[in-house]
Amino acid sequence: MKPLHAFPKRWLPWLIGGAFALVAISMMPSLMRHENVVQIRVSHAGAPMPDGFYLYQQLSAQGIRIKSITPSGDALIIHFDNEEQSLAAQKVLRRLLPDGFIVAQHDQAAHLSLA
């Protein structure tokens, strides 16, 4: 049995390069995926965060589908299925929440690069 001698050694760099190319291509969809995330923060230190269940009920009543709501330090992070849901939620949340809350698109690229 001669598995390494079944092909010429000059093919080895091409096989390794091909393997790296396949790995890179398979990872591209996960790297290019855009998260649809809204972040709610308080603008004044010490102010309480809104209740996540209340926000879920209000957004659901408006027909906005939520994937998840999670606390993250001094913020609530809300994940949505698509960008339209995220934009609609931002409009509803800005009307719903009183002054003192910051509702913004959350950039997860910074968090992913640190992980």
Curated annotation (Swiss-Prot):
Record-linked Gene3D superfamilies: 3.30.70.260
A GO cellular-component term linked to this record: plasma membrane
Alphabetical UniProt keywords: Cell inner membrane, Cell membrane, Membrane, Transmembrane, Transmembrane helix
Domain of life, per lineage: Bacteria
The keyword Transmembrane helix belongs to this UniProt entry's keyword annotation: yes
Xref: Pfam families: SecD-TM1
Ranges that cross the membrane: 11-31
InterPro entries per UniProt: Modulator_MzrA (IPR026574), SecD-TM (IPR027398)
Cytoplasmic compartment segments: 1-10
Electron transport in keyword set: no
Molecular function in Gene Ontology: protein kinase binding
Quaternary assembly: Interacts with EnvZ.
Family of the protein in this entry: Belongs to the MzrA family.
Name of the protein this chain belongs to: Modulator protein MzrA
Source species: Pantoea ananatis (strain AJ13355)
Gene that encodes the chain: mzrA
